[in-house]
């Protein structure tokens, strides 16, 4: 696919698989803007990055067989493999559009870790867990997540997604404080 916004150049092609997508050439601009992780001579994009960059018209996703994929097809593809993917995507898109750099946060007990600036120069500031309004959370769950985030010098943020179709997100932040 050609893109008028980049001088008519072809968009980087992204081969989609269960874990995200792989871009094998013309990905330098994406990498410079902190999208993906470079492995050898390919850029690995996680599922959220894959959908976001497709929605923004910055990559051209395709199946392993070379068939093009739309944003809706990508959302359905990843949702089948990861329940709650759409709610996570709504939060990913919101944070990215607010200027944050958003990466996986599973290592820290959340869906995302969020950087306010250059992730090569600073540590992430927040660990974000995504929930829907009917999600039951015990006080123990919240305290455990807050304490874990504190132990790695981050604030714990709960992102409550009210509606994935007409996105409404409520962010609640906790900090661990010794008295």
Swiss-Prot record:
Gene (UniProt): endA
Family: Belongs to the tRNA-intron endonuclease family. Archaeal short subfamily.
Xref: PANTHER family: TRNA-SPLICING ENDONUCLEASE SUBUNIT SEN34, TRNA-SPLICING ENDONUCLEASE SUBUNIT SEN34-RELATED
GO MF entry, a single one: nucleic acid binding
Signal peptide range: none
UniProt cross-references to InterPro entries, sorted A to Z: tRNA_endonuc-like_dom_sf, tRNA_intron_Endo_cat-like_sf, tRNA_intron_Endonuc_cat-like, tRNA_intron_Endonuc_N, tRNA_intron_Endonuc_N_sf, tRNA_splic, tRNA_splic_arch_short
Parts of the chain that traverse the membrane: none
Pfam families in the record: tRNA_int_endo, tRNA_int_endo_N
CDD domains linked: tRNA-intron_lyase_C (cd22363)
Main enzyme class: lyase
Any one Gene Ontology BP term: tRNA-type intron splice site recognition and cleavage
Active site, UniProt feature: 115, 123, 154
Species name: Methanopyrus kandleri (strain AV19 / DSM 6324 / JCM 9639 / NBRC 100938)
Enzyme Commission code(s) on record: 4.6.1.16
Function according to Swiss-Prot or TrEMBL: Endonuclease that removes tRNA introns. Cleaves pre-tRNA at the 5'- and 3'-splice sites to release the intron. The products are an intron and two tRNA half-molecules bearing 2',3' cyclic phosphate and 5'-OH termini. Recognizes a pseudosymmetric substrate in which 2 bulged loops of 3 bases are separated by a stem of 4 bp.
Subunit structure, interactors included: Homotetramer; although the tetramer contains four active sites, only two participate in the cleavage. Therefore, it should be considered as a dimer of dimers.
Catalytic activity: pretRNA = a 3'-half-tRNA molecule with a 5'-OH end + a 5'-half-tRNA molecule with a 2',3'-cyclic phosphate end + an intron with a 2',3'-cyclic phosphate and a 5'-hydroxyl terminus
Name of the molecule in the record: tRNA-splicing endonuclease
